[in-house]
Amino acid sequence: MSLTQVSWQFINTVSVTATDIADKTAPVNTTNKYAGLFVWDSTNHRLMRSEGATNVSVWWVVDGSTSITPS
């Protein structure tokens, strides 16, 4: 077995309400959104990851349990 050295960096996530995550006009969906962007859903206490860069790109809970499509 071989081990690879890695450098862990601090993950800086923005805290956003569930209402804003679901709103395609909210800044979290219209400003600097990209595939792989992480945000903290402060309403439901869960980490979300964007699937794409558009304002209607799906947000997935990182455990894969559910997704939110902004509308």
Feature locations, PLM:
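Short beta-strand segments and strand-loop junctions that repeat across beta-rich extracellular domains
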Residues: 45-58
